[in-house]
Amino acid sequence: VLLQETWINQCAVERRAKYTIFFSSSDSNGTNRTEAGVAIMIKNTLLNKIIDIEPISDRLMVISLRGTVTYTFVNAYMYTSKNPEKNPDIYRQLKGIVHRHRGGGPVLIGGDFNADVQSTDAAGNRAVGAHTFDKKHESEIRDEGMISNREELLDFCISQGHIIANTWYHKTETPKITWKRPGTIPTHDKIRGHYAVK
């Protein structure tokens, strides 16, 4: 399970009866809580399958698991539309992660991308499926930051041959968005892999 906004000290590990949580944040002294933070929660029965854990920052974390092939899971947490200028660096890091791990097996990226992908984005590319969550009211106008986040997500997926998986499967409206603060635009969480989904 990939978690965002964990607000936990850097590189902490929390072990429970049935699962272990590995945290990553930007706090280097281990005493302060961060504004972001990502974590990956794993069943204890899978701990012996862990090949590597990379706590990169409070916005990125990677874990590789051994199976019949190596599965690499990346947890990404993009900045909101208030700070979209910080996202290109995260996307550069994501491209590097995909490049390093792609030959070993599936690379699955999930998290909170703070992006609003629309059905019109599906035209002309294979990254977006037919099951997007489109605006329902004119009052839900996208701001420039949200548009920038969307474009960066689409550019990344297209350039890397990834899909935005939750746009490829029919589901009710609620699972298409994960959170909507009153008066704001719905934000989507995406998972995508470099292999074709049939």
Give the predicted meaning of each segment:
Residues 1-198:
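A shared catalytic/ligand-binding motif for oxyanion handling
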